[in-house]
Amino acid sequence: MVNPQPVPPLRVAPLRVALVTTFYPPCNFGGDGRYVRSFAHALARAGCEVEVIYDADAWCAMTGHSEIPPPLPEPPGVTVHRLSSRWPTGSAMLTQQTGTPVVQKAAIKALLDRGFDVIHYHNTSLIGGPGVWALGDAVKLHTAHEHWLVCANHVLWRYNRELCDARDCFKCSMTFHRPPQLW
């Protein structure tokens, strides 16, 4: 027997996407931050609910700025969570050295525990390194915008003068005036 009642259409909730990145405009240097912003806007236009999580401490530590610029306007469907602390250099250094979000771990965990369908990591070098990947419970993706997972200086350019074809990371980090990563 056929049910005479029409079946209501299924209501499909929008896909909830978290984008986790170190840099995001206006606290960025170009490439990866701009890409993540464009990607967030494209996802929102496609009907997704997007939340961007980034850490302004990294930008402050790398630029020497103590004041964070005001946020840029975002379209409907994009929410930006800017993390910062009273010790931006210390926070960035602890993250870089340990490969985990030492100062901002609780804040990142609380944000990622908000029921996302997808968590998409981008340049996470100074927002939590590989340790941030353990946070949140969703489908997880990582886009490698640079080589920091295999090169502490991000560029595979040994001693800032030649193609890297063998590991000499401690000496190379010193050439780049960066502390070597402990992990």
Region locations from a protein language model:
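Short catalytic/ligand-binding loop motif for oxyanion handling, primarily in non-cytosolic enzymes
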Residues: 26, 59-62, 127-130, 148-158
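N-terminal subdomain of nucleotide-sugar transferases
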Residues: 2-73, 112-114, 136-139
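Charged, low-complexity surface patches
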Residues: 32, 100, 125
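A conserved catalytic-core segment of Leloir-type glycosyltransferases
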Residues: 52-114, 118
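Short N-terminal targeting/anchoring amphipathic segment
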Residues: 109-128, 139-145
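Acceptor-binding helix/loop patch of EC 2.4 sugar-transfer enzymes
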Residues: 87-91, 142-183
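Short aromatic-enriched loop/helix-cap "lid" or pocket-rim segments at secondary-structure transitions
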Residues: 31, 62-66, 93-95, 133, ...
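Short, flexible active-site-adjacent loop segments at beta-strand->alpha-helix junctions, enriched
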Residues: 23, 56, 84-86, 125, ...
